Design a protein with these regions (language model features):
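Gly/Gly-Pro-rich "capping" loops immediately C-terminal to redox-active cysteine motifs
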Residues: 3-6, 14, 18-50, 59-64, ...
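N-terminal alpha-helical segment
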Residues: 9, 22-24, 54-55, 97, ...
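The canonical Cys-X-X-Cys-His
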Residues: 13-20, 73, 77, 101, ...
Length: 188
């Protein structure tokens, strides 16, 4: 149980995801600037027990959140500026993995549709992925692939992730983590 006295509703989430929505720990995804529709659907999936691929940690936390505050929490994180990263590939990034990930994300390959078909600003249900923690992305793709992440809308991702090799999952994760930034749904 979390002692919520004196806390704004979003501060409960900020304990792991950071007050600025840019978690410094790769286990916790960056929420700043994420699409509000996506954030709300994930909170509801955790709350209603439809998403369990984190060992139940989020379900137990989200059930402590007053349902009347969910829209405010979502609005807070969606309205924060997304992470800013240099559009130049950072030193130390595996260039081969980066380029392979870029090609998969932007062009796809035989049998696998390009990621950016859905993961772009025009598709409200698909999350923004650029600048997200590579380890988090890798885990989510593997959870889809091995059917550990099952929730509303997961069927499409499961079928796509099953087509990816471990090297491709790694490459996509490296590319997205290192490939830039995005703006939030709210103008700054």
């Amino acid at each position: 149980m979390i002692d919520k006295d004196g806390m704004a509703p979003w501060e409960i989430c900020g304990m792991c995801h950071s007050a600025d929505g840019i978690s410094r720990m790769s286990k916790f995804p960056i929420l700043a600037g994420q699409k509000a529709t996506y954030l709300k659907s994930q909170m509801l999936d955790f709350r209603q027990g439809r998403r369990l691929n984190d060992g139940g940690q989020m379900s137990s936390i989200v059930t402590e959140v007053d349902p009347a505050t969910i829209d405010g929490i979502v609005g807070y994180f969606a309205g924060l500026p997304g992470p800013l990263m240099n559009l130049v590939v950072q030193p130390g990034v595996d260039q081969v993995a980066y380029e392979a990930g870029r090609l998969l994300f932007e062009e796809g390959r035989s049998g696998a549709v390009a990621c950016n078909v859905c993961h772009n600003d025009g598709h409200p249900a698909a999350p923004r992925l650029r600048a997200q923690h590579a380890a988090y992305l890798r885990k989510q793709l593997n959870d889809f692939k091995y059917e550990r992440r099952v929730s509303e809308g997961a069927t499409v991702m499961t079928s796509i992730a099953k087509l990816l090799t471990e090297n491709e999952i790694d490459s996509i994760s490296v590319y997205l983590h290192s490939s830039g930034s995005y703006d939030s749904d709210v103008a700054h």
